[in-house]
């Protein structure tokens, strides 16, 4: 089938060349794996085209030991070739055999079996088989070392989790405080497993003491906090956090009370205008209710800071003579100044309608004689109140009646210029203002 018996010495050199080329190539293919050489490439006895090395001189002999000879010769030639040369030498058996064989020498089954190994990529080159035990043993040794190191690292990592790591800071503090005090700590929440912080459950006795302390002091100093911590069997941190939360709750309650108790329109931002613009408006923090009132502040101390600004007290504490240019605008026949009663710093207008006047330090709108607004500024606090005394009557039944005033002049300019005169100074003196 493969070779005819008539091929003799004429074809012997070609056969030896082909045999040499062929036995180099099976060494390359043997590098893929010794056990799969017979199965993958079909180096079986019926398909073997060339004689083995033992029967190289006799071409007429059979080929019983071809597979064994390939397996024995492959390890000897495999170390000489690299993995990069395997790709280039895969076609050498087909080309060498087709050139030297002369058509009839190349079996059809060999080409069909040599072409399928081309598409799969070549595996990495094997280690030199001269010492097959050492590298083989070295690789598992490395793997075992890596496995041992990984297992040892995992064991060390698992061993590094100590029981004190599972406890939080607060739990350890609670345990320490329980151990030092020797009392029962059942009122506190039990320490959870590996939790960040537990919610503190205060007893009723602790809450009573904390509320009592908060009623007197909203901010605790550290000595008092230490004392409370020892008294209530709590930590300083717990007491500090409780006071912070209690202050926030108090602030929220105050905001809610302010919104509920002050209806719309009675906030300081919506305060009414002055009495000259609104005829029947008065501030009755200390006055009895008048029928024309529109603003009744429920708590005057709450608006103590805005009272001087709301009603312009700074304008009323000025010297009395500064108001003369304002009254110079009225006609002369209608303006009848009254003499000062017992040197009291006050004047009123009888014929003027809707003109603001001073009556002993009380601002009176003469548009409504009996029920008009009265701005009693005696209760207001002002920086200049030391030199100005508002001590006159609040209610004035008529425009021509003056309340009992202080016998001593309260305005410094009045005592300097108007004490000797019975009438007010002439208006032209103050035209330069």
Curated annotation (Swiss-Prot):
GO terms for molecular function: DNA-binding transcription activator activity, RNA polymerase II-specific; RNA polymerase II transcription regulatory region sequence-specific DNA binding. GO terms for cellular component: aggresome; nuclear body; nucleoplasm. Residues 97-106 have a biased composition (Gly residues). Its main location: nucleus. It is found in: Nucleus. A motif (Antp-type hexapeptide) lies at residues 161-166. Residues 116-132 have a biased composition (Pro residues). One of its GO terms (biological process) is thyroid gland development. Residues 195-254 bind DNA. The keyword Nucleus applies. Residues 146-159 have a biased composition (Low complexity). Detected in adult kidney, but not in other adult tissues tested. Sequence-specific transcription factor which is part of a developmental regulatory system that provides cells with specific positional identities on the anterior-posterior axis. This is Homeobox protein Hox-D3.
């Amino acid at each position: 089938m493969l070779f005819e018996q008539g091929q003799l010495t004429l074809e012997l050199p070609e056969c030896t060349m082909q045999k040499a080329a062929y036995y180099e190539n099976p060494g390359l293919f043997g590098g893929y794996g010794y056990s799969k050489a017979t199965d993958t490439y079909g180096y079986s006895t019926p398909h073997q085209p060339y004689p083995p090395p033992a029967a190289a001189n006799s071409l007429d002999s059979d080929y019983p030991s071809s597979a064994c000879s390939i397996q024995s010769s492959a390890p000897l030639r495999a170390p000489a070739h690299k993995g990069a040369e395997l790709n280039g030498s895969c076609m050498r058996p087909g080309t060498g055999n087709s050139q030297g064989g002369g058509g009839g020498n190349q079996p059809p089954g060999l080409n069909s079996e040599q072409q399928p190994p081309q598409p799969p990529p070549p595996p990495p080159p094997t280690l030199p088989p001269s010492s097959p035990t050492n590298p083989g043993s070295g690789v598992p040794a490395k793997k075992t070392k890596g496995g041992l190191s990984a297992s040892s690292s995992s064991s060390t990592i698992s061993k590094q989790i100590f029981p004190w790591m599972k406890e939080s800071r607060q739990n350890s503090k609670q345990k320490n405080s329980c151990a030092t005090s020797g009392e029962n700590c059942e009122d506190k929440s039990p320490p959870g497993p590996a939790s960040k912080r537990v919610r503190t459950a205060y007893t009723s006795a602790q809450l009573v003491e904390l509320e009592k302390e908060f009623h007197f002091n909203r901010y605790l100093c550290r000595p008092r906090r230490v004392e409370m911590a020892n008294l209530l069997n709590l930590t300083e941190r717990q007491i500090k956090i409780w006071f912070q939360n209690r202050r926030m709750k108090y602030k929220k309650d105050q905001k809610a009370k302010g919104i509920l108790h002050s209806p719309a329109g009675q906030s300081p931002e919506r305060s009414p205008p002055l009495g000259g613009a609104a005829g029947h408006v008065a501030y009755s923090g200390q006055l009895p209710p008048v029928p024309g009132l529109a603003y009744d502040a429920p708590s005057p101390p709450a608006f103590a800071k805005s009272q001087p600004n709301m009603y312009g007290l700074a304008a009323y504490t000025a010297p009395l003579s500064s108001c003369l240019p304002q009254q110079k605008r009225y006609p002369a026949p209608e303006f009848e100044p009254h003499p000062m009663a017992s040197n009291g710093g006050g004047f009123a207008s009888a014929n003027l309608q809707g003109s603001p006047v001073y009556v002993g330090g009380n601002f009176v709108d003469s548009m409504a004689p009996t029920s008009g607004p009265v701005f009693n500024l005696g209760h207001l606090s002002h920086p200049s109140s030391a030199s100005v005394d508002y001590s006159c009557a609040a209610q004035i039944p008529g425009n021509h009646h003056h309340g009992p005033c202080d016998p001593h002049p309260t305005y410094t300019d009045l005592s300097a210029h108007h004490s000797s005169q019975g009438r007010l100074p002439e208006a032209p003196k103050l035209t330069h203002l």
